[in-house]
């Protein structure tokens, strides 16, 4: 009798722990999605505008080529960061679903 109750309590505790972990993972996924969206909708367009403006100034022979390369590099690095973040997001979603259906 006590053994069965103990096992039931242990099972309940494990379920609560798993549920808490899943809620935590859900929150992480949502916050990462928001961060990626902000990067795609705000940061990358701003870097693209900076690059375009820098390139125009370069075409007018007012700045040197390294400034244009720096602006291009900043934009490209941010695009790479977004791709890295998306990879992490997709891996997190896979882990979440594995845990959910375990």
Pin down the residues of each PLM region.
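Amphipathic alpha-helical coiled-coil segments
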Residues: 2-81, 88-99
């Amino acid at each position: 009798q006590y053994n069965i109750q103990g096992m039931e309590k242990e099972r309940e505790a494990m379920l609560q722990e798993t549920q808490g972990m899943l809620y935590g993972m859900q929150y992480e996924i949502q916050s990462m999605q928001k961060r990626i969206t902000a990067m795609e909708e705000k940061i990358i367009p701003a870097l693209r505008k900076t690059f375009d403006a820098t390139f125009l100034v370069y075409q007018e022979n007012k700045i040197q080529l390294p400034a244009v390369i720096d602006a291009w590099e900043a934009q490209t690095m941010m695009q790479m960061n977004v791709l890295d973040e998306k990879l992490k997001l997709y891996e997190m979603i896979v882990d979440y679903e594995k845990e959910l259906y375990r």
